[in-house]
Amino acid sequence: MVVSPSPSPSQTQQPAFGIPPPATPSAPSSQGGVAAASPFGAQALPAGLNVVVLDPAHGGTDPGARGTGGIRESEIVLDLAIQVRRTLELQGFQVVQTRQGNENPSFDDRSATANAQRGAVFVTLHISSTGLPGTARVYVNSDLPPIADSKGLIPWDRAQAPFFGLSRTFGDLVQGFLRQRFKGSPDTAQTASVRQLRTTAAPAIAVEISSVTVDDRADLDRMAPGVADAIARGVAAFKPSYVVPNAPGVLP
């Protein structure tokens, strides 16, 4: 489930993170080629966007959305992350996960994992509690307070604000590929108040698939290869547009 409640004051008054300086564009390598096991052709990756941070939502004592037949969101998105990771790695991307097993890192720990990377995008994975089965939706954060105070500093809980435009571009690309795979999915990314995205200083999206209301978990598992392919295609398509904004500093 994507939409989450607003953070408490204690969650917003966090230590500062450093927003990396703008990336220096470089020309694509001429020694590219199609990977033999790749689901689609990929050129050798130049400097810039090379890291994808995958966030399987929930975990530990938080199962996320639950459906009939023992369906638990936290378990399904962890398996989905493995599929997405394999597909991305075939394209030459480095992949970092916020969790590897049944643990539940805090929102801030998950964001810190992404914020520590350079040249990264962030994708948090969810299963809907009420969505249309068989579809997939991308969300970008809509809860964007002013970017900086009068001194040009950004509080931790507003870290996503300078990246909103890039997140929207990235989200629309991924949503377009998901729509090609899953009939009835939206044409473009939607906006929502997504707590996990708010403190992430990188292009960041939430991908929510199908619904836990399906009769059989196998219905969700069958979507995994298509979701993984769509995300990987979206990342590859976004790569030429990737640049780190020349954002202000961050409020301690």
Walk through the language-model features, giving the residues of each.
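Catalytic-site microenvironment of enzymes
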Residues: 1-252
